[in-house]
Amino acid sequence: MEDLNYGSIRIKLDEMIKKQGISKNKLAHRAEMQRTQLNQFCKGTVTRLDTAVLARLCYALDCKIEDLLEYIPPENK
């Protein structure tokens, strides 16, 4: 079976945090999430995106989902 590349999702949370000038501790509190989970989002190491967490982040940062996520299409072979 051929190994297909569908592209990837880039998480831009770290950029939003810097842009808004909010601390990670404050954001974690506002979004009701653990600091370690927030760090995984910032580093792009989270393996499963939880829509409830994404909604809380959008609410806490007063932003849209496209401000946090970007689809990177696959490179042509």
Regions found by a protein language model. Give the residues of each.
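A short, Lys/Arg-rich alpha-helix, primarily the initiator
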Residues: 1-21
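Short, charged recognition helix plus adjacent turn
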Residues: 2-3, 69-77
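Short alpha-helical elements of helix-turn-helix
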Residues: 9-11, 50-54
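Residues within the helices of the helix-turn-helix
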Residues: 14, 25, 55
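The alpha-helix within a helix-turn-helix
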Residues: 17, 28, 58
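Helix-turn-helix/winged-helix DNA-binding modules
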Residues: 19, 46-49, 60
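DNA major-groove recognition helix of helix-turn-helix/homeodomain DNA-binding modules
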Residues: 52-67
